[in-house]
Amino acid sequence: HKDTSQIYSERGWFDLDDKKGDFIGNAQYLEGNTIAKADTITYDGGLDLVTLKSDTIRSEYYSEKDTAFAKTIFYDKKNDVFRLTTDAYYKGEKNEVTGEKIYFDKKTEKFNVTGRSVVSDAPMLIEADTLDYDKSIKFGIANGHVIWRDTAAKTAIYADHVVYKGEENYMKATNDVGRPMFTTDIEGDTLYLKADTLKSFRIIKERIIYPDKNAARRAKKN
């Protein structure tokens, strides 16, 4: 039955009235296509909450659409919210994230990642020490050794801080020390651009003047 949950462990307790329990020692939770593994699983059926905790290994959570690893995994099924703590990894249908801590609201598609993090949201690939990213409105704030790549446009930004507003086609990069750098690939060659503040990279790229090779050859002949 699709609504039936099964939990296995070496020891633990479960209150049938409150639908709450702790399952300790090689605990496993099974429900349909969902599998969870941890040292300890805490289950609250009334609130539809599952918490996985492990000391030496990472807890594991698998479903049709989600894969999550971390020492502690908190999943609020009712609100579709994941909180992953310590050595965290999450992969969904379109996103892949690593970091020390990950908060992900599936309904609003908001990420908050702390610790050195990598977020893949094609064609965007973002690395930073901390990152807030709202996919639904294409808004992101990244801080600390930021590398923000657009794999489709073959561009990259290296900065201490980046603010991104995708719907406005706006991006601002700044540094605490030194200057941020923008790179773009042009016919196999890489263009490097540094400035105190970099803004609106797509506009900058469109204004790049490509050399007219034929005109240069004609000038040499004359």
What are these regions (language model features)?
Residues H1-N222:
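Mature-chain termini and adjacent capping regions
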